[in-house]
A protein has these predicted regions:
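Membrane-interface micro-motifs in multi-pass membrane enzymes
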Residues: 5-14, 68-72, 132-146, 188, ...
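Transmembrane signal-anchor hairpin modules in multi-pass inner-membrane enzymes, especially those
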Residues: 1-53, 63-64, 88-98, 153-169, ...
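Selective detector of the "anchor" transmembrane alpha-helix that sits immediately C-terminal
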Residues: 324-346, 394
Length: 412
């Protein structure tokens, strides 16, 4: 709904009702098990949420930040804590995946058919998924979450008692979802799927989390040390966005002439300047869109730059947290991502666990990795369509860890 309401129908009213119901259930039943807080991922989520509340109190736009905080609390309570409770029955894990896969496939197939009628042109690819998704990038980010799940059901469907026919259906679903990502013309989603494939091989090699963390730290340090040389090399790429998929892929690193990439750099520069001004608490959750305009440098402005804040946000989860919640906000948000990876790897590498649990967790990890990589270039965690798989995938991993130490549970 437009007109300033900013309401997404029918999902947000449904989330509100579930939020009220779950709160009432907890108050009446008194069944609050706080033991799962000992799991590092849960602790990291609560710390991030707690710091967000502090930055609401120090916000430069208190009511805007309060509204943002409440919206995030709805998503977290329903898609993480409520689903965590539901997922103690493993049957609901299969249903969660199946229903979302079937529904997503219908939307993607419908979008592809419409796009086919326009010769799969890039221009139409940016809006063809409406009214289901407002933007091609959030559409692609959502689909990328479920590609590993569809592939897992295809290859490991026997662990879930799926028939050969059902596994063939999931194979078709996998192809449809991959086609959806490709013809979304979303370069960040393409990169995220490649990153998920690379991460899968790390899992197969049983690379430990500490080794991955050290490697990521080395890459980050190397970038800051050699950033001038890296940027100079990237400036040599003049390939612009194009209908041709290969040329469009080559434009990923074009920071000289590609408007989308240039505007992304502009938004990041604004976020850094905002961080330097308020490094501890930031400007407040949900305020970047309204505050970044004065920090734009004239030399960074592009054809799609705006002062009205109506064309996207920070274009990065990480820069967004940095500008809105300061350094602690960024570190706490990154800690959530890292703790989820650590928990996932721990489950996958536990040989005493049943095969279906390791397979599910592998798919969850790969799905989350697609978003963590995509999050460098876009930020959608405050959208319900992304919040559902983001928090839902984490909830499943925590449920597997908490409810089934050395499980004998079967998925039927």
């Amino acid at each position: 709904i437009g007109g300033g309401f900013g309401l997404s129908l029918p999902t947000e009213p449904m989330i509100w009702l579930l939020y009220i119901y779950y709160g009432y259930y907890l108050l009446v039943s008194g069944k609050i098990n706080i033991e799962f807080i000992k799991i590092p991922l849960v602790a990291a989520i609560l710390i991030n949420f707690g710091w967000m509340f502090i930055t609401v109190c120090t916000s430069t736009m208190f009511f805007t930040s309060l509204k943002y905080f409440l919206a995030r609390s709805w998503f977290m309570v329903i898609f993480f804590f409520f689903l965590f409770k539901i997922f103690q029955n493993p049957l609901f894990i299969r249903r969660f995946f199946s229903y979302l896969l079937y529904g997503s496939t219908i939307v993607v197939f419908y979008t592809l058919v419409k796009h086919y009628g326009e010769d799969f042109s890039r221009g139409w690819g940016y809006m063809i998924m409406r009214p289901f998704f407002s933007d091609h990038t959030i559409y692609a980010a959502y689909i990328a979450f479920f590609v590993p799940v569809a592939v897992m059901f295809t290859l490991r469907g026997n662990f879930f008692n799926f028939s050969v026919f059902h596994r063939l259906v999931f194979a078709v679903i996998s192809l449809v979802l991959i086609a959806g990502v490709i013809f979304s013309y979303t370069r960040a989603a393409w990169i995220s799927l490649l990153a998920a494939i690379a991460f899968y091989f790390l899992i197969k090699l049983k690379v430990k989390f500490k080794s991955i963390l050290i490697a990521l730290s080395a890459v980050a340090i190397g970038f800051f040390i050699y950033q001038d040389k890296i940027l100079y090399s990237l400036e040599a790429n003049k390939k612009g966005s194009a209908d041709d998929l290969e040329a469009h892929a080559q434009s990923v690193s074009n920071i000289t002439t590609d408007p989308s990439n240039l505007e992304r750099m502009n938004r990041w520069n604004c976020a850094m300047m905002m961080f330097r001004e308020k490094p501890v608490f930031g400007f407040g959750p949900g305020t970047y869109t309204f505050k970044y305009a004065p920090y734009q440098n004239s030399k960074d402005l592009t054809l799609i730059s705006t002062n009205s804040g109506d064309l996207g946000n920070t274009h990065s989860e990480y820069f967004n947290s940095l500008s809105e919640m300061g350094l602690i906000g960024l570190l706490s948000w990154v800690s959530v991502f890292l703790c989820s990876i650590a928990l996932g790897l721990q489950i996958v590498y536990e040989e005493k666990r049943e095969a279906w649990q390791r397979s599910v967790t592998t798919a969850l990890l790969l799905g989350l990795v697609t978003y963590y990589v995509h999050a460098f270039l876009n930020n959608y965690s405050d959208f319900d369509k992304i919040a559902a798989p983001l928090w839902g995938f984490m909830a499943i991993m925590v449920a597997i860890k908490f409810y089934w130490k050395y499980p004998e549970v079967k998925v039927k």
